[in-house]
Swiss-Prot record:
Gene coding for it: IE2
Catalytic activity: S-ubiquitinyl-[E2 ubiquitin-conjugating enzyme]-L-cysteine + [acceptor protein]-L-lysine = [E2 ubiquitin-conjugating enzyme]-L-cysteine + N(6)-ubiquitinyl-[acceptor protein]-L-lysine
Enzyme Commission designation: 2.3.2.27
GO CC, one annotated term: host cell nucleus
Protein name (record): E3 ubiquitin-protein ligase IE2
Organism: Hyphantria cunea nuclear polyhedrosis virus
Length: 375
């Protein structure tokens, strides 16, 4: 039959084991010696004792050490709230060690060693206690050590934990607002959707409070017409005082607020989310199609405009061609007239040359006649 030995066991075995541990671990000199250094032997440190005894960790090693058990030369360290079931064995072989008591006992032993092993200086004088008695190291005995250890153990003992009160059952209550006649469901003594005036304690819902104080510096109660600068909003921890700081009039702000609520604060529904995503995708596709139709219409209008420009340019080109043909005809006519005139000019030049030759011959003949007549 297994036995569970922990802090909640209502038996005297734990107290007896702790008492045995105290008697075994408490050190006090039995007989006074001339010099404390010659009578006291160095006590083994806890590290040396743990090195000779195998240790086992029960629970999380990172949690604080709660208790230790020594069973058959094996040490079991219980951390945190872990449960420990010692193996079936004789009760006398199970030694329970409270970690806090062990630390207090070690501090008492170290204090006793410092008092008994410190050599007196040449200027030593007894220490006077507040009661007027002179305390000397020679007056210490084992009873003083036991009383000091008991006092340290009592001081280091953990205070008893008071049981936490059971949480109150939550009750949903419907509360009516006298201004907007809306009903709100709140948890009684836990939260509230209503705001009360600090003057009259008349309650209104939060949306009515916002409507009343909007663009005002003070809150005026709609029931008793009292005016106050602050109102109170309550929850299970207390209340918060509210006052108007600044008011901004913009109809787009509530739309932005609801857009944020729609994106972040709506209850999650997978089918609804898929439908909304498909609707958004359909809206995007419709917008893309509309933009594509608009671009096609713009391209068609641009094409028509370009076609008109091409037709106009073709008309201008035809006009230029007609003008070119007309000018070519005029050029041909002028060329023919020029050729005719050039031929006439050439004929006249030839005729003039013939006449000039005749004139020269006639002139030479006349000169000969004149010379012959003169002679």
């Amino acid at each position: 039959m297994s036995r569970i030995n922990n802090a909640d066991t209502p038996t005297n075995r734990r107290n007896l084991s702790l008492a045995r541990g105290r008697r075994r671990l408490t050190y006090s000199p039995s007989t006074p010696m001339p010099t404390p250094r010659q009578t006291r032997a160095p006590m083994p440190t806890p590290r040396q004792r743990r090195s000779l005894t195998p240790e086992h960790v029960v629970g999380d090693r990172n949690a604080p050490l709660r208790a230790s058990y020594t069973i058959n030369n094996s040490r079991y360290n219980v951390h945190g709230d872990a449960e420990f079931n010692p193996p079936e064995d004789d009760d006398d072989s199970i030694i329970f060690t409270d970690h806090a008591a062990e630390q207090a006992r070690q501090r008492a032993v170290n204090l006793h060693e410092s008092l008994t092993t410190t050599p007196r200086s040449p200027d030593y004088s007894p220490v006077h206690s507040p009661s007027g008695q002179v305390i000397d190291s020679d007056d210490y005995n084992s009873d003083d050590d036991e009383r000091m250890l008991e006092q340290i153990l009592l001081e280091s003992a953990e205070p008893p934990q008071t049981p936490q009160p059971a949480p109150e059952p939550q009750e949903d209550v419907e509360v009516l607002c006298h201004i907007c006649s809306c009903t709100f469901t709140d948890i009684k003594n836990y939260n509230s959707n209503f705001v009360t005036s600090s003057e009259c304690n008349h309650a209104v819902c939060f949306k009515c409070y916002v409507s009343i104080v909007f663009n005002k510096e003070a809150y005026k109660c709609s029931i008793c017409n009292r005016t106050t600068l602050t109102c109170r909003a309550y929850n299970r921890a207390g209340y918060v005082e509210l006052s108007t700081v600044r008011t901004v009039r913009d109809n787009k702000l509530i739309k932005q607020h609801w857009m944020q609520l729609t994106e972040s604060n709506m209850p999650h529904n997978r089918d609804k989310t898929i439908i909304e995503e498909l609707q958004l995708e359909l809206a995007d596709l419709r917008a893309t199609t509309a933009r594509a139709h608009h671009e096609v219409n713009m391209i068609k209008s641009d094409n028509l405009l370009l076609q008109q420009q091409v037709d106009f340019k073709n008309l201008e080109l035809q006009q230029e061609l007609n003008a070119k043909v007309k000018l070519q005809k005029q050029n041909d006519t002028l060329s023919a007239a020029n050729t005719f005139l050039q031929n006439q000019l050439d004929a006249q030049v030839a005729e003039s040359k013939i006449k000039m030759d005749q004139f020269v011959r006639q002139h030479e003949a006349f000169l000969k006649k004149f010379k012959s007549s003169v002679m």
